[in-house]
Amino acid sequence: MLQNMTEGAPLKLIIPFMVPLLIGNVFQQLYNIADIIIVGRTIGVNALAAVGAVSPLFMLTMVLTIGLSNGFTVVTGQRYGAQDMQGMRRSIATCVVLSVFFVFLIMGIMHLVIDPLLVMMNIPPELMEDAYAYVMIIVDGLLAMMAYNLLSGIMRSLGDSKTPLYFLIISSIVNIILALVFIISFGWGVPGSAFALVIAQAFSAVLCVIYIYKRFPQLHIHRSDFQLDWPELWAHLRMGLPMAVQFSVLGLGIIILQSVCNKFGSDQIAGFTTAMRVEQLALQPMISFGIAMAVFTAQNFGARRFDRICDAVHRCSLLTLAFSLFAAVVVFAFGEEVIGIFLDNPSPTVMESAHLYILYTVPVYFFLSQIFIYRNACQGMGVSMIPMLSGVVELIMRSIAAIYLSVPFGYEGICMAEPIAWISCAIFVFAAYHYFVRLLEKKYTLVD
């Protein structure tokens, strides 16, 4: 059901809304972590390093599909809210056409640039074969990833946020089972992990199609719904492209960081990859609060309730501070034990590399938590350039820090890059939020 967030205590609205998002995000991370654990423990350090070395490319393709599909389905949700069923079916048809177009466009570009791209990323020769196989299987299976993201986005736009979560859980279980079968029973190695991921995503997409077909007969699209024109296409592109660009800028920053890391060898790559997976899991509560913040802010901005926006941002800022401190304590206390899960008898260099990354990043989780709150608050108020510019700030600071600090400090310089990027971005979005919330409140007060 759709939820009205313009009345009632902000946290009592935001927290229940955030919990399903958190569960879904955690399973999304477990979806990826399961592959890393299975690869690391059953094949070895080099296999884990190969997957880790190209994981930013996988992440880039993933965020592209998420950005596009989330943006496209905004139009679907708007028409559903207006009870424009014919327009909604046209929107779904447009989403399908644009999604297929962009999938094949991305696939074509990746096939053209993958060889020089892997060289530019400094993939060690001993990892190249597995790294190439893994990323190309993911790229060739991009249609499955886009299909799931689009269909789950359509369901969320209709107010159904639980069913995509159920399908994601089922998909995660299928992924783990297939990875074990392909790697251990069939002996397919790293490609087996990629095949398991693609098949699991395709399976979840099929479940979405079946559910939508049976649950929402009003969504059955017909040939006439595919009679598209430029205004219809542009209505979706102007939503999807900015979100895809915003996510892609962050993905490019991670690619540059990984490229610098790849110069230091398999053990450092494995340690860096493992530490980042642990970090992503620890950050999920803060990420989920950010998503909920965007929804809350958007509704209250529409109602011109700037007092509620400021109150919610303040309360969520303090709450995510508590979460960031808790996450820091947990990662500091149990980080090495968790890292040990990923590999069977990891070398001291792997453990040291992972621990060093944690040592530098955990103390600044607070700054990262504030980025999620303030950036999403700006997004909810319709100031879409701030999230995009904040991504550019992160990209520039992360890239400069990684490239220049890695020369005198080696691998340790890479670990310094993330805190520098986060602190810079946090200062930017904090200042931008306070500027625009005052500006917009003054503007609409004068209008009213």
List where the protein language model places each region.
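Short alpha-helical transmembrane segments in multi-pass integral membrane proteins
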Residues: 1-18, 76-143, 183-241, 297-364, ...
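Residue-level signal for short hydrophobic patches within transmembrane helices
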Residues: 7, 11-30, 34, 57-64, ...
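Transmembrane helical elements of multi-pass membrane transporters/channels
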Residues: 16-35, 137, 148, 171, ...
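Helix-terminus/linker motif at the lipid-water interface of multi-pass membrane proteins
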Residues: 26, 30-49, 118-125, 181-188, ...
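Small-residue hotspots at the loop-to-helix junctions and early N-terminal turns
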Residues: 45-56, 131, 135, 194, ...
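Small-residue-rich hydrophobic transmembrane alpha-helices
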Residues: 48-108, 145-164, 271-335, 368-390
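Hydrophobic transmembrane alpha-helices of multi-pass small-molecule transporters
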Residues: 60, 175-179, 205-209, 281-284, ...
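Short runs within selected transmembrane alpha-helices of multi-pass transporters and secretion channels
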Residues: 69, 137-156, 164-172, 193-208, ...
